[in-house]
Amino acid sequence: MSAIPQEILHEAVTAKKASIQPFAASEKVYLQGSRPDLRVPMRKISQSDTPTNTGREKNPPVYVYDTSGPYTDPTVSVDLRLGLPPLREPWIEERGDTELLKGPSSSYGLQRQRDPALASLRFEHIRAPRRAKGGANVTQMHYARQGIITPEMEFVAIRENQKLEALAETYKFQHPGEAFGAAIPQVITPEFVRDEVARGRAIIPSNINHPESEPMIIGRNFLVKINCNLGNSAVSSSIEEEVEKMLWAIRWGGDTVMDLSTGKNIHETREWIIRNSPVPIGTVPIYQALEKVDGKAEELTWEIFRDTLIEQAEQGVDYFTIHAGIRLPFIPLTAKRTTGIVSRGGSIMAKWCLAHHKESFLYTHFEDICEIMKAYDVAFSLGDGLRPGSIADANDEAQFAELRTLGELTRIAWKHDVQVMIEGPGHVPMHMIKANMEEQLKHCHEAPFYTLGPLTTDIAPGYDHITSAIGAAMIGWYGTAMLCYVTPKEHLGLPNKQDVRDGIIAYKIAAHAADLAKGHPGAQARDNALSKARFEFRWQDQFNLSLDPEKALEFHDETLPQEGAKQAHFCSMCGPHFCSMKITQDVRDYAREHGLDEAQALAKGMEEKSDEFVRSGAEVYQRT
């Protein structure tokens, strides 16, 4: 728990240096779009020159996707008490289909606003909420289906291309991929983005009340994304700690963040997070609704849930996990499972269904929920409340019965032009993972798949970021669009900052491995650049090009801490005499000096060694 008194909260909520410090040799750059206010951020990684016999060879910079927002831009000063600039506000206003409200329209939002006891916790600079004008639909899917390319779509297209046109010839080589039916173009255009969103194959989570967000896209024909979970609980964390966690997550590469808070002051905590987040924020609204009935699932009502949806939509939540696929007939299917129902949201709704012996209000009021979603452009993340919690329960009838229902609900949401992604498992052994992707594509009509792992074995508590990253890489290759990270603390406790970092890096590896396997254009460029740096013993460039430069440097310095070791032409694994890359370089130098190609140099070198062996007496072992 934080020891900071509430009355000085606003002074306490400041960004820690470690969360906003740019990576070494990295610079925030912006690619200009078609309008002055459309500037797309990238991270430019500079490299050192390669020494050659004739001078120095320039190594071009590498451009990479950047999720850290303006925080890592040293030219921008961000005050967390004021929040981020409303990047998308002019775009939203220009469309002319929304209106500003005088204040919150949810009962709970009004109650919190009028409570004087919360003044010290409240984010001070709250904008009036915005809502669609009567009869209007303000979703990105609706615009896409009208043939409109929004600034958000253009922003996404520029961002996904990662400045491929500037890619050096040295880094362009890429192995052909196997995309399992995905249709990934060589260049992502705004029109392609529009078409994918219109078809429902991709979503751009972009609530009109979260204008601070930098547009991003989730779909299998785009880069694989990762989500990071954070949130307080009844026994831990504070507002300032949750904001800090969000900053930490996006620095290391979180594409979206889910606030799963279940403790005190959920409403106020969420406001602080959204106002300072450049990435989409997701929630599970049933968690907060449950708090409103003191944790008694059977006392939940549609009215309480509806008010919670409006409350969160008007704060700016970009996507809601809603477990509308849990139906009363499916609950008995879990009776013989090894681990039953492991989803929190799933167990809440199962308990409600059994207590009332009828279908859940999430299912029966689904079209009413769609009406709310399209008034704010909140995307559905249709929850997998019956996901397997052990590999023994993988791919059972309960799991797939719910999945088929999610496909039916997707059709209903699309009828309202509401954006949808589908949540997936869970715990699945490797040989059963592909079937999950195939079933999802078959029954959910190519809506983006968003999976928790899956974990490929149950025997590694403390290492579930690894057991799940294996499954995540596989299912990402097969077509999953976003991977929900798992930390080493999964099943054991609440993650700290180091656990969050470890989980994110494990999932960045999984997502990138999937992009490589799919053959996503330009995915291999960073690998090629790092491999070249490794071969040329450019140690600092190796560190800087890695997903975790600080860890790479730390590990190197544990063995070779001297500054001179960073210029050494060998590594700590093999030493100076057995380094395979150094030997290869020696062969190339020999070839150059004697006017030979590499094959001739190897043959000539072997011949010289043979002569030396014979001259020394042709003895295998020499007396010393």
From Swiss-Prot:
Enzymatic reactions: 5-amino-1-(5-phospho-beta-D-ribosyl)imidazole + S-adenosyl-L-methionine = 4-amino-2-methyl-5-(phosphooxymethyl)pyrimidine + CO + 5'-deoxyadenosine + formate + L-methionine + 3 H(+)
Enzyme Commission (EC) number: 4.1.99.17
Enzyme class: lyase
Record's keyword terms, sorted: 4Fe-4S, Iron, Iron-sulfur, Lyase, Metal-binding, S-adenosyl-L-methionine, Thiamine biosynthesis, Zinc
Pathway: Cofactor biosynthesis; thiamine diphosphate biosynthesis
Pfam families in the record: ThiC-associated, ThiC_Rad_SAM
List of residues binding [4Fe-4S] cluster: C571, C574, C579
GO MF, any single term: zinc ion binding
GO biological process: thiamine biosynthetic process; thiamine diphosphate biosynthetic process
Region (Disordered), start-end ranges: 40-61
Subunit note: Homodimer.
HAMAP family in UniProt: ThiC (MF_00089)
Name by which UniProt lists this protein: Phosphomethylpyrimidine synthase
Biological source species: Methylococcus capsulatus (strain ATCC 33009 / NCIMB 11132 / Bath)
Lineage: Bacteria, Pseudomonadati, Pseudomonadota, Gammaproteobacteria, Methylococcales
Gene: thiC
